[in-house]
Regions:
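Conserved PLP-enzyme active-site core in the AAT-like
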Residues: 1-22, 26, 53-67, 72-279, ...
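Conserved C-terminal alpha-helix-loop-beta "cap" of PLP-dependent enzymes
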Residues: 3, 311-392
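A structural motif shared across PLP-dependent enzymes of the aminotransferase-like
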Residues: 20-32, 42-51
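Flexible, glycine/charged-enriched surface loops at secondary-structure junctions
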Residues: 45-50, 64-66, 247-250, 294-303, ...
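C-terminal alpha-helix
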Residues: 81, 392-399
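Glycine-rich phosphate/diphosphate-binding loops and the adjacent beta-loop-alpha structural elements
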Residues: 267-270, 290-297, 374, 379
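Active-site pocket-lining segment
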Residues: 277-339
């Protein structure tokens, strides 16, 4: 077996949490067992995806589901499905779609680097609205009528980045889009927990919703979920699966795709680069069952205790420690370490850099460094790492 050390790497203390750049969330033993079991057996992938999709549909309250190669892959596949449907010619031409509708309307304030996944399928964005609060120009944000005003014969759909503060409200956007027969693709990659979002976002009327499988669900980091309308999920599936078969032998389960809707056998679609292994499907489905049943809830108290250990070890340092979060939020508690930069003579960025460069390397949450605060998330830490982390931070704070 090849280890990280064999490759010349030193494993870090991940005090950041389930972020992609550090490898995602820890997979529970049952998820790892499912992955290994899947590795030793073989099934047709269209049958596996059909069965998994039925269970995803049950848990999300949607018509159909698909296991994808991450939430970004869900967005690319969802976009491709909206652009093409079951039109084999369009499927063949992606990402070149100049001769059919390919524009997605999006709130200007919801643009991000992640929406490259939508553009990768060939879509073009039409931006609407302003966040005049952020620009210090007023009190208004994007409003639903602005979406509708941007709809033209070139509009294929609407893209919406879901969050607790997203504006305008998703139901208002959906209502405007559906007036014109336009589907709405929702990016909800990081919106789990709470568990209820698995079904509540789609219940608002979204046509397709994408979730991450390697964060709160704690499946393989390279997995995600796409769920929603049966016809769109079916289109996404045939643009992802291996289509190297004879037409008279290809027999996908009707729960996945109705062959009668196809004029022939598609060639490999744009989603072929986003394939998912059988092991990943089994592992993701195992993790999804654990997540949706609340099996992870009992870990909150253990995580809180780790943070208490870290905070106690930093008593008397040039920092103030505050444990944030509640069990009701269904998220791991976090420890905010507000550094007295004047007393220390170093900035939070300096401390963060020192933690990464030390032994063992430590990666902390960096979202509040500009405010002089380190954030510790215990999700990816073990109990024996808490004292070591406290020691390392203490060293950087002058101890």
């Amino acid at each position: 077996m090849t280890s990280y050390q064999d490759l010349g790497l030193t494993p870090i203390i991940n005090a950041t949490g389930a972020v992609t750049r550090l490898g995602g969330a820890p997979m529970p033993p049952a998820v790892l067992e499912a992955f290994c079991e899947g590795a030793g057996q073989w099934v047709p992938l269209e049958q596996l995806q059909a069965a998994a999709g039925q269970r995803i549909a049950e848990l999300t309250g949607t018509e159909a589901g698909l296991v994808t190669a991450g939430s970004a892959a869900s967005l690319t596949l969802g976009t491709a499905a909206i652009l093409c449907g079951f039109d084999l010619g369009r499927i063949e031409r992606l990402p070149h779609c100049d001769d059919f509708p390919c524009e997605f309307v999006i709130a200007r304030e919801q643009r991000s680097g992640y929406d490259h996944a939508v553009r990768a399928a060939g879509a073009r964005f039409v931006e609407v609205g302003f966040n005049e609060i952020v620009s210090n120009a007023g009190v208004r944000r994007t409003e639903a009528w602005e979406y509708e005003a941007a709809f033209t014969e070139n509009t294929a759909g609407v893209f919406y980045g879901y969050g607790h503060d997203s504006q305008p409200p998703l139901p208002e956007v959906i209502e405007r889009a559906h007036r014109h027969g336009l589907p709405v693709l929702v990016d909800a990659a990081g919106e789990l927990p709470p568990k209820r979002n698995l079904s509540e976002i789609a219940a608002l009327g979204a046509d397709l919703v994408g979730f991450s499988g390697g964060k709160a669900i704690r499946g393989p980091q390279s997995t995600g979920i796409l769920c929603g309308r049966r016809d769109l999920v079916a289109s996404a599936a045939i643009q992802m699966l291996d289509m190297d078969d004879h037409l008279n032998l290809w027999d996908p389960p009707p729960e996945l795709v109705d062959r009668e809707q196809l004029d022939g056998l598609p060639r490999h679609g744009i989603g072929r680069i986003l394939k998912v292994s059988k092991e990943e499907v089994l592992a993701l489905m195992t993790a999804l069952e654990l997540f949706s049943s609340g099996a992870y809830d009992a870990e909150w108290s253990e995580q809180h205790a780790r943070l208490e250990t870290i905070a106690a070890g930093l008593s008397g340092r040039a920092a103030t420690c505050t444990i944030e979060g509640s069990i009701e939020a269904e998220r791991s508690p976090t420890l905010a370490i507000a550094i007295d930069e004047d007393a220390l003579g170093r900035t939070a960025f300096d401390v963060c850099r020192g933690l990464r460069d030390g032994t063992p390397p430590v990666y902390v949450g960096h979202g509040r460094l500009a405010q002089g605060t380190l954030v510790i998330n215990p999700l990816c830490m073990s109990d024996d790492q808490a004292p070591e982390l406290s020691r390392r931070i203490g060293e950087e704070l002058g101890g």
